[in-house]
């Protein structure tokens, strides 16, 4: 239950480090938090790493549950996306693109922020798992490249969720109940139960279960829409809402046609219009067992299951004029079911002087999503061909006439992801002058995804004298989820299997040059990653006038099988579907099937397409730290990051200006230069941590949707960029006022695209990166006092500000995300076994913008939850 839309992670982490009711004048009033950010236990103040930590106590204090929701409030960290299970995390402004449904799986970029649950990485293509934050020991946020220790996707940082483990010799039971009321929205409720039981002296178990019903607050309002608004009928020069005009290359095929004789039937959503339609339920459990063989060896096994059921959407249409600015018009039902099961195991022990950790995990994630696709109308040039009479789309020399069916469309999307990971590492003793961490890592991911794009109007449209389209069948050369035919109305199907296999060897050594004063660290990681595609992106273009010919579309299995040959499918005439190989030339292909030299060149390129997208290399890290006193640490760091490459479904497609969609994209190279400080001042009353950094980004990966090139999302190494930044956080616990603390944090970013690597106008040199606000900050105060009868009371006001930012580096898809400021307040009373907390979130009812998706030429703005008041009760047995 999102009771904390205005909570700052850094501020909360600061709050978690405050000792309760310290004596006046006592030193070290600010507690140090122990973390494993360097893969060995150490205090946040003793390691030369930019790390913030939020303890389980702070999570309980502030009723934080949904990880991405409160992560968004950390300066320097943003979470782009459009609702539960559909978000991507960005740190320090290293972002390029807006997450979107059709790039959420097989075609999605690997995240550049790694998400860990205990010892296992959970990063998946397109978007991370949305793990409910139940019974956590702490959350660690590591900013900047962490690739030497944490591997792929740790380019911009790493986020670690550390769960509470079973405890021997301790019996514990906790129940939590919460209720919240959102202005103009539905009520939210949640229930959690936690139990820890020692079974024997060597065996203990721990379990947590939860149900969290989050009420909706966005209205699906009645509206109509017709194919008259299609991009096909839009002339060049039309000014789009983001200020970028329609170029001549993207002008509608019939942008100047006389449509007076065309009947446009409206899509009408009045039957599904509903207030507060974006409700969500998180349900799940986690069960763990710990067995201690002896003083040196232990085994921990954990199994977790979680289900998200979500209706509606979490974005609004700012063009709809209503009282609360929380409305959108959707013409088909939107829903999401996102389920995962996760089993992990960790063996910890000692071999002589070495600490040994082996961890493994297996995750199975299944999603079933239905998405209203009607907005595609605004960019889909070929849409009228499928839902209008052919006399409208292809009238010849005549004036267009006939009927266009309602343009309501939807996508049925299913995914099945399985991942296994294994890591073995060794640590030398922490007290040694020379300390070493070294190990190996392996992971194997398989993702099966099928997207059925359904155009109901295609079933009844008069296409060249007959109703609808003939049944469509999948390509037969490789992977397919079924043998067909596709369901009625399914015009396109993306049916793809993606596999990612990773292997890595890593090491990091620290040497105390001058003990207790100067230390140097050197780290390296060798990595080898292969990404492979099978399947197809199938179309129905020829099915309007003949039986299915398996024409057009993309036979992915044929292109990426590495056999040195490919079958041409770019014609409805099946006699031209000839197979060519490495012995063919441009001229021989032109002679054989009569295509242009440019098309023949595409075939030659496809023949030589790679079998897999392979990324391998070595990255390095170097660090020097100086500790003049036990309360002062300064450091300088050089670090690098990487992530997997990718194959493109429409690889080889030819666009304007000679641009060819690449078959393969490489890792983007991230080099980070950083100086930082960690200071405990004024006899432990003040803590001030911070850093300044410069990030050099080469070959930045981005996802592009440009219908003038191809009607599929594709990815490319589109640009080079630079990031300058300063970030910091502080805590002030004045000795003169017992129980009073202040905490805050800030982030300053300056990002710029320095070079454009694609010969199109999609990316512009000098523009900013996405999700990179120039300034963000937060401030909170907390006052605790003895309320008598063994009770402690507190109050906590807070303010959070996020600066304006862009949603994408792709100019035609970019929109401005406005800056916003929100206020929150919390108060509570606690006793030994129970606590009561009151929360007020977004007190000013601000429409804070988290994301703005302009991919389909209309702003769709994801906003924070409106003003919400909540109550939480907790009891410990």
Question: What does each model-identified segment do?
Answer:
Residues 32, 453-456, 460, 798-810, ...:
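C-terminal beta-signal and adjacent terminal beta-strands/loops
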Residues 88-90, 103, 141, 154-177, ...:
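N-terminal periplasmic accessory domains that precede
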Residues 103-143, 193, 235:
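Short acidic/polar hinge/loop motifs at secondary-structure boundaries
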Residues 183-310, 417-422, 430-443, 497, ...:
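Transmembrane beta-barrel wall of Gram-negative outer-membrane proteins
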Residues 290-294, 304, 426-429, 439-443, ...:
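Structural signature of Gram-negative outer-membrane beta-barrels, strongest in the C-terminal barrel
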Residues 346-374, 627-651, 664-726, 730-731, ...:
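Membrane-embedded beta-barrel scaffold of Gram-negative outer-membrane proteins
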Residues 386, 390-423, 486, 502, ...:
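Outer membrane beta-barrel strand-and-loop segments of large Gram-negative receptors
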Residues 436, 517-520, 685-697, 714-809, ...:
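Gram-negative outer-membrane beta-barrel transporters
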